């Protein structure tokens, strides 16, 4: 039996945790990079070949804009508000793009991702709170994503497979996809490209079948309109766009390309290509969300079913409304939902690896980190599936609680991100300028206020009793105090790793 020193696959690594090992990165600057002209400051002209080499991280990032939670928000917004909130979907996606571009900027400029920087930036007690909050957000999102995928499996199996069986299948095949990374990150990115393509095709097919009103659709996109009856759906559209774990994830994904951070030209060029591919990815995600919203706006807006439709019964409602056709719309919906649930579950596990590795620096092998993070989420998800398998109303209530959990966590990803990208000793010459900084904080404040409204509305309806109210008030006080601490605290991070 070999000794631990001879073990070719040790569970622990000797070196510090990194998002990607050097031999696993994609070579983006090589054969056609002119070191003399590209040097440290000159940015080479645009190249389609290089854009292709940098394409990938943005499409993994955009999955969080297409997860089952977002799809449920889309269908409810369409059924209740019709086409009237499409303009808000557009601007919410634009706000999400700004946040994700800042996350990518942080990762490219520093060579480290957000969780790693938080480990260096904050004292142990604050760092542990941030880590716990990130993990809770991830578990909440994962439950929604796995349940969404399990619902799709139940639809496609004609109800033969119960919800808990779909949960186990989803959890298992997640590792199969992550195994692709062993053959190169581009293989994993290609798999995600296929899943996004499946979503685009299925929901576009349904969009064509529904035949929505083109004038109403364009008016919904171009003319802002909001009524008192649709405020809750409007808040939901904005609130589910920014996912805490996605902010951590994108700052790590951009490090999958080999970049010399000592060459300003390379960093600038990388940021340019990442900005283009992220914008393209979120444009596609916007179209998919638009398809889902308009399908349900056309079919259910103004009907008695509008207020009762949800992710669990949406497929059957679609089947009853639009009938069978060449290929039953129920199964088209199931395929699209499965692609959304499966892809978002994988990115959730991927994000969990970076969050745990960055905050704790345990030095674990990737497969072991994936096993730990998957287990943390799958156990509560199986319990949820067993308890709520036959109750649509209970699943809707659970989904409201999980949305509330996501809303609580948003400041603990946004505030550290905005503080870090604003500090010259961390970002060097890539520090955000005063105008971008102001706009970013305004967007962050708007998102946090909107989610604060969600929390206030939720707790005003759900919190009853003296004991429960006291606990919630105490938690709220501690919550607000910690947010103030994050905003006001001076950066004390070491500068030994900062770009030059």
From Swiss-Prot:
Tissue specificity as recorded in UniProt: Expressed in roots, stems, buds and leaves.
Catalytic activity: Mn(2+)(in) = Mn(2+)(out); Fe(2+)(in) = Fe(2+)(out)
Coiled-coil blocks: none
A Pfam cross-reference name: Nramp
This protein's record includes keyword Cell cycle: no
Main location group: Golgi
SS bond partners: none
UniProt key word Transmembrane helix: yes
Topology in membrane: Multi-pass membrane protein
UniProt GO MF annotations: cadmium ion transmembrane transporter activity; manganese ion transmembrane transporter activity; metal ion transmembrane transporter activity
Compartment(s) of residence: Golgi apparatus, trans-Golgi network membrane
Superkingdom, taxonomy of origin: Eukaryota
Signal peptide stretch: none
Keywords carried by this UniProt record: Golgi apparatus, Ion transport, Membrane, Transmembrane, Transmembrane helix, Transport
InterPro entries per record: NRAMP_fam (IPR001046)
Transmembrane parts of this sequence: 51-71, 79-99, 128-148, 160-180, 188-208, 234-254, 280-300, 322-342, 370-390, 401-421, 439-459, 467-487
GO cellular component: trans-Golgi network membrane; vacuolar membrane
GO biological process, one term: iron ion transport
Membership in a protein family: Belongs to the NRAMP (TC 2.A.55) family.
NCBIfam families: nramp, Nramp_1
Main function: Divalent metal transporter. Can transport manganese (Mn) and iron (Fe). Involved in the control of cell-to-cell transport of manganese (Mn) between organs and tissues to monitor Mn homeostasis.
Protein's recorded name: Metal transporter Nramp3.1
Gene name linked to the record: NRAMP3.1
